[in-house]
Amino acid sequence: MKIYRTKTFDSAHILKLPYESKCADSIHGHTWRVEVWIEGIPNEYGMIFDFQKISNIIDTLDHKFLNEIQGLEQPTAENIVLWLIKRIKESLSDGFKLKVRVWESPNSYAEEEITVRRKFEL
């Protein structure tokens, strides 16, 4: 079974790039759109994952200067995807699938899809 959640957040950032770019060397803002898909087996409460938990994680980025958030010192769409995956997967069981897509604009997004694998030590 799969669940899906989408949510927007507004934030500012600046990118440090070795070439000239609209997003480089100038603080600017975006209304980002995040999409999250989680696939797995529902728990004893009939839920794969609580939608509110997804919203709470995304809300930590809302109305922030992203460069000041630990782990987002270079806040590209790609790095925001990885930052979100790291936080969401902490609450997922082994074998669950997670996909996160972050839209920087109506025409541009980054996404990553993973299968959660826990490493067991003997």
Regions flagged by a language model, labelled:
Residues M1-L122:
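Charge-rich, low-complexity N-terminal segments
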